A protein has these predicted regions:
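Gly/Ser/Thr-enriched, mixed-charge loops and adjacent short helices
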Residues: 21, 102-153
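Generic structural "secondary-structure junction" signal
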Residues: 7, 12-16, 99, 106-109, ...
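Short, surface-exposed, polar/charged, turn-prone segments marking secondary-structure boundaries
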Residues: 27, 31-33, 67-70, 96, ...
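Short charge-dense sequence patches
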Residues: 1-9, 70-76, 102-104, 127-133
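Ferredoxin-reductase
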Residues: 35-109
């Protein structure tokens, strides 16, 4: 079974979400959507999420963008952090799907991607991927989780 794309992101069997698949979707997202120069990244607590998140971060940096690593946190906390900062985000999460699966949720600076964004990403996937970028920056932080907790407690 190959990964499925739509409804705000990519979902599939963990075994199908290899580094190349992740890189293709992250690069297509960065080319097709208004990501700016920074993408926030977070993950859920599934055992497969750290490896997938590392592939996401590596690709963000390989396309010359800054990756802000928020580590493990709730999806709404990542969304709040990225929207507040005016940046895009990618959340590694399987949400409610079975444990042998995982996925990516994509956010533009205004919130979750919409159908127009999804169409643009699919079109970008069909174009040759560029590889002539200067390596981007990596920033690790836990401030999003603290801000989220403070806001709601």
């Amino acid at each position: 079974m190959s990964p499925k794309f739509g409804t705000s992101g990519l979902r599939g069997l963990v075994s199908d979400l290899n580094d190349k698949v992740i890189a293709n979707y992250v690069q297509a997202f960065s080319e097709a959507c208004p990501t700016g120069d920074t993408i926030h990244v977070g993950r859920d607590l599934r055992s497969s999420s750290p490896k997938i998140m590392q592939a996401v971060i590596n690709t963000i940096r390989e396309v010359g963008l800054t990756a802000i690593d928020h580590g493990a946190l709730p999806t709404p906390a990542l969304a709040l952090a990225s929207i507040t900062a005016g940046h895009s985000a990618i959340m590694v999460t399987g949400s409610h799907i079975p444990a042998d699966r995982n996925g990516l949720k994509f956010y533009v600076p205004s919130g979750e991607i919409n159908k127009t964004d999804e169409t643009a990403i699919v079109k970008a996937l069909k174009r040759p991927q560029s590889s002539s970028f200067q390596r981007g920056i990596y920033i690790e932080t836990s401030s999003a989780l603290n801000t989220f907790i403070t806001r709601y407690i």
